[in-house]
């Protein structure tokens, strides 16, 4: 409050206070406030003879804001100069900048680049013997492995990870214990899910007591995901509604998308309920849609379409009706309808127009 109400410009002597406020805003899940505070930190860096370290830290927090709001191009453009800043490594934030940048590239569909960044950070920290940073980096490595479908690698990390103690400050961009809970849920075993449930319950109490809203949101979302995969759909919606209500003021989007497709069904039910968070839920679902398109492009979904479906898709693109398509291909209208429904399902579309747009986005169709 003192910084916000200060009559004059914030000076270099107040830099530690501004940095502390950045972390407070982050843990409070107040992305708008964090953006403002990070601006102040960048200005201090500019005033202090272009202090590269101060500018790098300000860019780190700006990058977090842009990433969580799913503004991926802005996040990348903001983080790259922070990583290149000569004093960033001395500040100790270079690894954290690298973690967020890797998440950006993963979200952009550049999985190999994301993996290369994290693996390079782990190798560097192993050489330098920086134990605390390596601890976080290996958790990030496991998190990325899980997101890229390399469950065995994530499971190997989990086998060697002790979640205790849970009493420490969660102030960076990820929490290793939450990665562990995700691995246990992904394993699909009853024992793993039971362990995940107990850990998440402990973390919920710890984070609520510390007013750490940022990671409380993620814990609630993971609890909803766990309940969803266990078939407890009503409970999943109730818990997820709490998470979304906490996330909406700050505009958090990526937090949900990064947890995976299991959250889509309860999010859709929340959206249909048309509550006070319906608009924000729509933004999250739209980001899930974008994520699927990126992933689908990597997996070449076009290969899943049959030759007949591809022919029908091309005819849909030139706006032929079902009757015209049946005459063109000498098949019944019922057969056209069946193939069209298969096309919609494979492209996750709900209309002809949406199917054609997605097919063009995935380079299944071209205008030529």
Predicted features, each with a name:
Residues 2-7, 39-50, 80-90, 119-130, ...:
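Amphipathic alpha-helical segments of tetratricopeptide repeats
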Residues 192-226, 294-298:
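Generic long, charged, amphipathic alpha-helical segments
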Residues 237-252, 261, 271-278, 289:
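TPR/TPR-like (Sel1-like) alpha-helical repeat modules
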Residues 9-12, 52, 91, 131, ...:
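Inter-repeat boundary and helix-capping residues of tandem alpha-helical solenoids
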Residues 1, 13-30, 54-70, 93-109, ...:
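Tandem amphipathic alpha-helical repeat scaffolds
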Residues 286-289, 293-341, 345-350, 354-367:
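Helix-turn-helix DNA-binding segment
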Residues 31, 72, 111, 131, ...:
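TPR-repeat structural position
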């Amino acid at each position: 409050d003192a910084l916000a109400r200060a009559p004059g410009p914030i000076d270099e002597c107040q830099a530690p206070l501004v940095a502390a406020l950045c972390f407070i805003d982050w843990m409070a899940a107040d992305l708008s406030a964090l953006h403002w505070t990070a601006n102040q930190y960048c200005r201090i860096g500019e005033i202090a003879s272009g202090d590269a370290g101060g500018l790098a830290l300000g860019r780190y927090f700006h990058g977090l804001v842009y990433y969580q709001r799913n503004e991926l191009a802005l996040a990348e453009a903001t983080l790259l100069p922070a990583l290149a800043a000569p004093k960033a490594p001395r500040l100790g934030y270079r690894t954290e900048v690298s973690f967020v940048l890797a998440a950006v590239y993963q979200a952009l569909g550049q999985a190999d680049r994301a993996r290369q960044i994290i693996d390079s950070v782990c190798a560097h920290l192993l050489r330098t013997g920086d134990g605390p940073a390596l601890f976080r980096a290996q958790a990030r490595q496991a998190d990325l492995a899980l997101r890229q479908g390399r469950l065995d690698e994530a499971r190997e990390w989990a086998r060697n990870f002790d979640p205790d103690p849970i009493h420490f400050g969660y102030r960076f961009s990820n929490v290793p214990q939450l990665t562990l809970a995700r691995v246990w849920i992904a394993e699909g075993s009853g024992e793993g899910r039971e362990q995940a449930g107990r850990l998440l319950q402990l973390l919920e109490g710890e984070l609520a007591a510390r007013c750490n809203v940022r990671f409380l949101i993620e814990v609630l979302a993971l609890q909803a995901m766990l309940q969803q995969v266990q078939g407890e759909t009503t409970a999943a919606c109730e818990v997820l509604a709490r998470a979304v209500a906490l996330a909406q003021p700050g505009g958090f989007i990526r937090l949900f998308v990064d947890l995976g497709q299991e959250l889509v069904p309860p999010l859709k039910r929340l959206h249909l309920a048309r509550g006070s968070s319906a608009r924000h839920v729509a933004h999250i679902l739209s980001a899930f849609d974008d994520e699927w398109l990126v992933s689908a492009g990597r997996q070449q979904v076009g290969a899943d379409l049959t030759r007949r479906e591809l022919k029908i898709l091309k005819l849909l693109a030139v706006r032929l009706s079902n009757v015209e398509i049946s005459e063109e291909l000498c098949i019944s209208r019922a057969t056209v309808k069946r193939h069209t429904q298969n096309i919609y399902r494979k492209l996750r579309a709900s209309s002809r127009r949406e199917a054609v747009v997605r097919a063009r986005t995935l380079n299944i169709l071209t205008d030529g």
